[in-house]
From Swiss-Prot:
This is Uracil phosphoribosyltransferase homolog. Uracil binds at T296, H297, F298. Belongs to the UPRTase family. Its main location: cytoplasm. The gene is UPRT. Residues 13-28, 70-79 have a biased composition (Polar residues).
Amino acid sequence: MATELRCPDSMPCHNQQVNSASTQNPEPQQAGDLILAHAGGNSDSAATLTLLSGHAHSSVPAELDPQASGGATFNSENNGGTGNYDAPASDSLLGDCEISRQIGAQLKLLPMNDQIRELQTIIRDKTASRGDFMFSADRLIRLVVEEGLNQLPYEECMVTTPTGFKYEGVKFEKGNCGVSIMRSGEAMEQGLRDCCRSIRIGKILIQSDEETQRAKVYYAKFPPDIYRRKVLLMYPILSTGNTVIEAVKVLIEHGVQPSVIILLSLFSTPHGAKSIIQEFPEITILTTEVHPVAPTHFGQKYFGTD
């Protein structure tokens, strides 16, 4: 059963308009490095993308699905239809080398394996039942949340076992919280609570203005001491990046530094990741896949409104 959130009524709400050729490839420098070469450059313009471990998985297709498009009705990230968001045609993980360099240290990918690939496949499959979709989404969310917790600071501690022995272990440093970007980000809340029972969770509501299509903050409510906490920002699909950018701006207004924000997502386009890192170079993005086509039907199918 999902836990009802109770945040202090004293926190401010926001209602404001927000303006928002091939070359010879170099060798990886160390295990876990993925070399990204500029399509029109030379070996000096290679960039390194940080992987959490092991294997690099290429997920950029030779061509995009011609039917992968949809109109935006909820916000600038999630399209209302069942189609997918197409990143700009020129956008690719192998595109702008300078941006790839900036992404390198901040963008973290879960190591690809068959289990994760299957979950991604079911989530993208338009014929998947809602039950299968939710089951797969919850499993993938749990994997992302677990790795997100691994990015938080720990401290050493000593405990006594039932047999009387001393054990040197670690524990979370105090001062962590979650923030979900409504509505699709709420799908990740239970996964976080399953791992951290007592963690505080705030919310931000951002929608696209029907006339200008610009992101607009309608509501924000956080723990009163959020400026002292590490923040796990939850938003499953990064397509344009606009919604996340506005959410981070609201967090900054409440005293949160971008360097303590870890963005948890399931899927990201190259354009979305680049946009966020360009705006906030210190933020950390954790995702399972960077792909030009984002499954922006996620929120509608997860909550049964597709």
